[in-house]
Amino acid sequence: MTTIGTPLSPRATKVMLLGSGELGREVLIALQRLGVETIAVDRYDNAPGQQVAHHARTIAMTDPEQLRALIEAERPDLVVPEIEAIATPALEALEAEGVVTVIPTARAARLTMDREGIRRLAAETLGLPTSPYRFCDSLEELRAAIDGTVGYPCVVKPVMSSSGKGQSKIDGPEDVAPAWEYAMSGSRVSNTRIIVEGFVDFDYEITLLTVRARGASGEVQTQFCEPIGHRQVSGDYVESWQPHPMPSTALDRSRQIAKAVTENLGGQGIFGVELFVKGDDVWFSEVSPRPHDTGMVTMVTQWQNEFELHARAILGLPVDTTLKSPGASAVIYGGVDAEGVVFDGVDRALAVPHTDIRLFGKPESFVNRRMGVALAFADDVDTARRNAAEAASRVTPRAV
């Protein structure tokens, strides 16, 4: 039986989010609707999640001493990592000492904090199909890996990066050195390690939101949302839609792969499992033990969106992954480099049928920074995609 206290009281149920961007913001709102006291942590002040939480804290989350000191001072019931750039050894130590419960587990946070841990788990421990890959620590190793194993074309990514940063495609030998330099510039930490992956000849890629939550029996069960299709540019998502049609054999295989990975990681919560699909063949790509950016579409497609599913699951509550309507999301970009922008055209965007928008409240805009998202539902995915894209195009951030 789950008991939830009253916020700001001695018996409050307290949840700390490490990382308070747009996804964390929605998780915090979902938790507050369930009566949870929330603590939003980020590396900079006035992050989107900090604007809605009961408490806001700003620290260097990659500093183990700062992270430990904050957790020991706040004593939350749960610590929920919402980004990868965290001092995970400190989380593992605190969990082992019984100081706090990490969602889904401290081990999962460590394994998924970079591409090496999770790729080795999927391919080498679990034997799941993946693209050919090698890890490299120098330009010379990268050249050797491409010539000896991976071949052309291939993709280079820092082992620690997000939202496509530092990711590039290599078509021939002349691209190798620029790709290495770009990967070094896109890493989240001072780390010269990269992964180089051979190209998979896939028809499409999906995100399969996978939820580990307690059912009526009290046992942890695995449930799946309908597959989410998405389009990326330079490794960063620009639109997503749900459901994405796929053969039953491929869907079954996708669920088998997602279940194998998430069961091994353990704990409770939502996982964004990314997969490549060609016909009935499926390859594992990545997994995040938290809501996924492509999953923002669920705010208009599901009875419980990915943030509500995550909040319920980590609190030990039942979940419902039922789809209620086809829908789509489209990114609203900053368009300008400025602080404290204003948004023109919101009224015109919301005049598009069956649409909604989310403006994230990021204090600083960049040309290619994701500042919001347009959402649309319709009788079919194609109509929803057109409407979401149209609504997004009508919102214009402006420097003042």
From Swiss-Prot:
GO process terms (BP): 'de novo' IMP biosynthetic process
Organism: Mycolicibacterium gilvum (strain PYR-GCK)
UniProtKB keywords: ATP-binding, Ligase, Magnesium, Metal-binding, Nucleotide-binding, Purine biosynthesis
Function in brief: Involved in the de novo purine biosynthesis. Catalyzes the transfer of formate to 5-phospho-ribosyl-glycinamide (GAR), producing 5-phospho-ribosyl-N-formylglycinamide (FGAR). Formate is provided by PurU via hydrolysis of 10-formyl-tetrahydrofolate.
Keyword Nucleotide-binding: yes
ATP-grasp domain sequence ranges: 120-315
Annotated binding of Mg(2+), by residue: E274, E286
Pathway(s) it belongs to: Purine metabolism; IMP biosynthesis via de novo pathway; N(2)-formyl-N(1)-(5-phospho-D-ribosyl)glycinamide from N(1)-(5-phospho-D-ribosyl)glycinamide (formate route): step 1/1
Positions contributing to ATP binding: R115, K157, S162, S163, G164, K165, G166, Q167, E197, G198, F199, V200, E205
Catalysed reaction equations from the record: N(1)-(5-phospho-beta-D-ribosyl)glycinamide + formate + ATP = N(2)-formyl-N(1)-(5-phospho-beta-D-ribosyl)glycinamide + ADP + phosphate + H(+)
Binding-site list for N(1)-(5-phospho-beta-D-ribosyl)glycinamide: E22, L23, E82, D293, K362, R369, R370
Top enzyme category: ligase
InterPro entries documented for this protein: ATP-grasp (IPR011761), ATP-grasp_carboxylate-amine (IPR003135), ATP_grasp_subdomain_1 (IPR013815), PreATP-grasp_dom_sf (IPR016185), PurT (IPR005862), PurT/PurK_preATP-grasp (IPR054350), PurT_C (IPR048740), Rudment_hybrid_motif (IPR011054)
Protein name: Formate-dependent phosphoribosylglycinamide formyltransferase
Molecular function as annotated in GO: ATP binding; magnesium ion binding; phosphoribosylglycinamide formyltransferase 2 activity; phosphoribosylglycinamide formyltransferase activity
Assembly notes: Homodimer.
Record EC number: 6.3.1.21
NCBIfam families documented for this protein: PRK09288.1, purT
The family this protein is said to belong to: Belongs to the PurK/PurT family.
PROSITE patterns noted in UniProt: ATP_GRASP (PS50975)
Ranges annotated as spanning the membrane: none
A GO term from the CC aspect: cytosol
